[in-house]
């Protein structure tokens, strides 16, 4: 999120950024990956197929989604994974949710989205962020919904042994544009700052009374 503070008198405009692609976060587009040949046309066709699959998955997700009156549904997150090793890719549901959120915010259909992606228009994100898998051993503690500090358990017992808890966290990049303020804010008049914001996810934790259970805890989820 971008926080704006009191106006400033004079500050020079400087800084540079990189392309930000909602959802998959890749730079460039399929047309720029190679020259105008059969391979490029094949990649474009593959992209259309991929987006068609995403559209079907999102339609199915809307059908099985719980009613809006269910508050737990609003707290659901795909950023937690139980695995025996570090996941190599972002969670699929996270990519789908991020992609859907962008479409909803832009109020456009999937077909319109294909012809107006940020990579083609040269758009830049307001704040640069970084996403990575974090283990419970690295987090150690977290704050639950009641405001209490709880211990995040590293391993979760399963019928055939134990699995580690991994959290997919997103925070402001220290090497990006954050130090210069929010991109797009006129520094001659405003002082801005990119800040990491948090959301609730469900994880296996232990409170100060040694009671183990699944609780909603806060983790970094956006910048």
From Swiss-Prot:
UniProt organism field: Exiliboa placata
One CC-aspect GO term: axon
Protein name per UniProt: Neurotrophic factor BDNF precursor form
Predominant cellular place of this UniProt entry's protein: secreted
Glycosylation sites: 107
Gene3D superfamilies: Cystine-knot cytokines
Propeptide, residue positions: 6-114
Entry function: Promotes the survival of neuronal populations that are all located either in the central nervous system or directly connected to it.
């Amino acid at each position: 999120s971008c926080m704006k503070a009191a106006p400033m008198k004079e500050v020079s405009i400087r800084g540079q950024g990189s392309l930000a692609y909602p959802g998959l976060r890749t730079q460039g587009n399929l047309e720029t990956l190679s020259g105008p040949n059969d391979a490029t046309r094949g990649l474009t066709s593959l992209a259309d197929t991929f987006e068609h699959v995403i559209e079907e998955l999102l339609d199915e997700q809307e059908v099985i989604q719980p009613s809006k009156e269910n508050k737990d549904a609003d707290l659901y997150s795909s950023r937690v994974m139980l695995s025996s090793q570090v996941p190599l890719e972002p969670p699929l549901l996270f990519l789908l949710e991020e992609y859907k959120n962008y479409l909803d915010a832009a109020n456009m259909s999937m077909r319109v989205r294909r012809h107006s992606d940020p990579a083609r228009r040269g758009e830049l994100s307001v704040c640069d962020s970084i996403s990575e898998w974090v283990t419970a051993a690295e987090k150690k503690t977290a704050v639950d919904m009641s405001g209490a500090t709880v211990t995040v358990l590293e391993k979760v017992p399963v019928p055939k042994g134990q699995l580690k808890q991994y959290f997919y966290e997103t925070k402001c990049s220290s090497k990006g544009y954050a130090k210069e303020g929010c991109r797009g804010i006129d520094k001659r008049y405003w002082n801005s700052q990119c800040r990491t914001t948090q959301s609730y996810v469900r994880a296996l934790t232990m409170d100060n009374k040694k009671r183990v259970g699944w609780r909603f805890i806060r983790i970094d989820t956006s910048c």
